[in-house]
């Protein structure tokens, strides 16, 4: 009995290492991609980000349209006409008129135009915050998809290692049963675990395929192979270590709060513009024109004609002051005041939402970091427990089921530890996103954690 049981001593640990080598070394002929490389690819491919970039690009041209209100406008007009008149004496009068004119207008004083320009600048700022938010979202989506693939690869590797260890345990149980040193129960228990491991392997393999497709579609490539974390894994610490500095930074920097504040400023300017509609506007106008008139008189006896050219120029100031608008201006002011209050509440909602999200993200990273430390300790203790259980099985004080349970515990712990490490990295990025601090430099920082 001891001879057969000795065959399985330390086999699960050895098989885990072999399975991991096969999983990550089997694709050695394919060049693995870093997070930085895939993020750069996604910036040039992701439709959501590119749409946000195009929208932000269009906003600058919309702002330029508003700037035109502070500049003069010049127009050129050209008209031509022909008129024929028959008079009772039998004569016919033909008149040909050609006119050309140049008109110019400049708003010397128009409070509404100045406010519109200010609104356009703030709308441009809001569009830029949207682009910043889209960039942060892209970083998180790429990182999430990247580490989801790595987690799925690790899950498949540990599942296969567990299956290999169970297969060895099953073979040992069968041999022991054949020589009469074990009952059929050991064999059936091992067979049941092996069948479950096979099902788990199928599910893990499919999950890896799905996660791979998600990453491929995000970066516009096929068969992406992410680089794993460098060993030993060195996870970055969360700094500052207290939540309040994160919340304070989020209140100042988060794109949604900045956009809401800009929206409030636009609403306040709209109220000022509505009030400005009650004021005076002064325009400087000028015209320069020329006309050519040719007349001809024809009848039964003779035909006579004449032509003349005239030129004209004018320069003037136009002053407008609305005396009565039927209540439209007053109601417009009331409308904008209500919209201003709505924007003020939007700011409050954005601040509360961001504060809550930042706290959730901070505590989530703290919890995950503690989980990693606990799982690292659990991995060490699970290895020792498996070795002790194997030794107990060898000397006859442990049964086959105990070994299977110890194996399952070790492989489950290793899978959960790998996933928790990835979650710490991704949620660290999400924390910086929640605080409005996430930028491409953070991608480079995470990239340093990967294997070279």
Residue ranges of predicted features:
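Metallo-beta-lactamase
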Residues: 204, 255, 420
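A glycine-/polar-enriched beta->alpha junction
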Residues: 40-50, 57-72, 101-119, 128-136, ...
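Periplasmic alpha-helical coiled-coil/stalk elements that build and connect Gram-negative outer-membrane
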Residues: 2-3, 14, 137-249, 361-364, ...
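Amphipathic alpha-helical coiled-coil segments
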Residues: 51-66, 134, 138-157, 168, ...
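Small/polar, glycine/serine/threonine/aspartate-rich low-complexity segments that form flexible
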Residues: 77-108, 230-240, 272-273, 285-332, ...
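Gram-negative bacterial Sec-dependent N-terminal signal peptides
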Residues: 2-31
